[in-house]
Amino acid sequence: MMRMPPFTLHTPASLDEALEIASNLQDAEKEFDWVAGGTDLLPNYKWHLNSKKNVISLANVTELFELKATHIGAMVRLHELVESEVVHPVLAKAASMIASVLIRRSGTVGGNICLDTRCYWFNQSEDWRESIDWCHKCDCGTEADCRVIPNQNTLCVATYQADLAPVLMCLDATIHLASSTGTRSMQLTDFFELDGMTRNKLQPGELVTHLTIPKDSAQWQGDYQKLRQRESWDFPEAGVAVMWKRNGVNAPNDIRVATTGLESIPGFHQSQAQHALEDWNGKESIMSLAESIRKAVKPVQNTWYTPSYRRKMTRILTKRACAGLLEDSK
């Protein structure tokens, strides 16, 4: 049986209280984690993956639960996205493909966006990691080498495998952050860091409060396609979101493409999408776009499927996600 290491649970009732607790822990030089739904953090704690002595629960921070068409709180549950009548249908579809019904009842939007990167050598029990002389991402105190790209201890290539980010990136979402020193916001496309250990631009003591989506998001159509081992459970081995906008003509006047499950960050493929718009030719342009996305992604051997297969499937997923472009032009 995998037992969680002991920790102190803090249960603030407001955002200000949560940030104050975080600030006090920092001043005392005590490490901590935020916990939202706990569907990722708590299993990692059972595996003794970077566990902390203090955990701050956001379950009672009501400011983070708001859900509107243009505002999605960090504590909104995934099943709420699926069932909502105001959420963009492509975002609702992506949410419906996350894990299982039970996990979607607990998992949150903020937790999915900030999902820890995953790797075959990292997401294992402590005994398993010890048997292969530890892992660079978790067991840094052992001076362990990276098991995916050996002989370098500067970069972690663990894979980002969350589903919501590519759709939200295509919807031009802005992510909003808060800490005891103030608030800030940035485009979601700028939030992620190309390192499996750093992961994103959250500073110590900072948390995600909500995401905002432009009011014109309803004008965008699209789809999200996902490759996984089991349809009812697994993280994406590859995921592709494609969104487009028309002005009553056959050719789209804008296209956005984003990917997940292929690198340490979700990819936003603006140049490939814009190139596809030039001299648009329906199916041929879609085939060219799909091939350019396949060439752009750089998966490594740290998930169940091989990098070559995931790249090939990225091309197929892109074509599938673009199917609506051909239907709309008929």
Predicted regions, residues:
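C-terminal structural segment of proteins
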Residues: 1-330
